[in-house]
């Protein structure tokens, strides 16, 4: 029988797709199954690709959208910071859930992800966090029902297992119906599919030049234990992430060469 008792007293939800994004609605439905009290503090507009960035040189504007629901003119990191340190300062959340992102956040791409950035900002200020993303094969037919069906049990299992305070969890749901998902795998980050950044240029109706940034993706060899491989095999991929980014091989080589 599926567990129905509240897991948390208070949970904070955020994302990088914006407060009106369908993935946030999915996450709210998930959170109401897990918590007695759900707070939503999310960007007023799409903030995809903003990573861990914080708005240090301009003020944040916070707009109340309902009971315990706020839109912030800022990044996902801003949302987490102002929620925990201001809006919820008298009763901090037990956990921050970030997502559900439209599309997977895998490998190198997690460095740029605002969804993951929000979770890592939460970790920085001492609140456990999970980033959740729903992979798709057709952007116009994202299988949100997969995350909706599986996320409550996945979160319960992760909380029961526990994880270190200097890590947040990155969860990716595969692009298939929930009944066809093969299970859950704990994975490493791996390389993912991000190859670089492309520039798409043009001219607007006023004949002013513009430039769009586009992430370039392509299949690449990856570690057998990576999240990208697990997702491709039909598993929910769970990867613990941390801030520490030292390249150990380069460190050893430079120390040998330079002392």
UniProtKB/Swiss-Prot annotation:
Cofactor note: Binds 1 divalent metal cation per subunit.
Catalysed reaction equations from the record: a ribonucleoside 5'-phosphate + H2O = a ribonucleoside + phosphate
Cofactors named for this entry: a divalent metal cation
Molecular function (Gene Ontology), one example: exopolyphosphatase activity
EC number in record: 3.1.3.5
UniProt: a divalent metal cation binding residues: 16-17, 48, 101
Primary localisation category: cytoplasm
InterPro entries reported for this sequence: SurE, SurE-like_Pase/nucleotidase, SurE-like_sf
Protein localization: Cytoplasm
UniProt keyword annotations, A-Z: Cytoplasm, Hydrolase, Metal-binding, Nucleotide-binding
Enzyme class, first EC level, given as a word: hydrolase
UniProt GO cellular component terms: cytoplasm
Chain's role: Nucleotidase that shows phosphatase activity on nucleoside 5'-monophosphates.
HAMAP family the record matches: SurE
Protein name, as recorded: 5'-nucleotidase SurE 1
Organism: Burkholderia lata (strain ATCC 17760 / DSM 23089 / LMG 22485 / NCIMB 9086 / R18194 / 383)
């Amino acid at each position: 029988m599926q567990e129905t008792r509240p897991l948390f007293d208070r949970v904070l939800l955020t994302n990088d797709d914006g407060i009106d994004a369908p993935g946030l609605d999915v996450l709210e439905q998930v959170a109401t199954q897990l918590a007695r009290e759900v707070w939503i503090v999310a960007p007023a507009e799409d903030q995809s690709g903003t990573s861990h960035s914080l708005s240090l040189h301009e003020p944040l504007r916070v707009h109340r959208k309902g009971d315990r629901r706020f839109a912030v003119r800022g990044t996902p990191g801003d949302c987490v910071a102002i929620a925990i340190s201001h809006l919820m300062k008298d009763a901090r959340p037990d956990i921050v859930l970030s997502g559900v992102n439209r599309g997977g956040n895998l490998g190198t791409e997690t460095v740029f992800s605002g969804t993951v950035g929000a979770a890592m900002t939460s970790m920085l200020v001492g609140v456990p966090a999970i980033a959740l993303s729903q992979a798709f094969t057709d952007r116009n037919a994202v299988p949100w029902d997969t995350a909706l069906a599986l996320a409550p049990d996945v979160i319960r299992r992760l909380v029961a297992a526990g994880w270190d305070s200097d890590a947040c969890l990155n969860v990716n749901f595969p692009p298939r119906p929930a009944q066809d998902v093969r299970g859950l795998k704990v994975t490493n980050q791996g390389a993912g599919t991000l190859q670089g950044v492309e520039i798409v240029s043009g001219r607007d109706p006023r004949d002013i030049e513009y430039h769009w940034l586009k992430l370039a993706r392509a299949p690449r060899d990856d570690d057998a234990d990576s999240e990208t491989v697990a997702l491709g095999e039909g598993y929910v991929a769970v990867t613990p992430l941390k801030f520490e980014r030292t390249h150990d091989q380069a460190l050893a080589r430079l120390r040998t060469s330079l002392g």
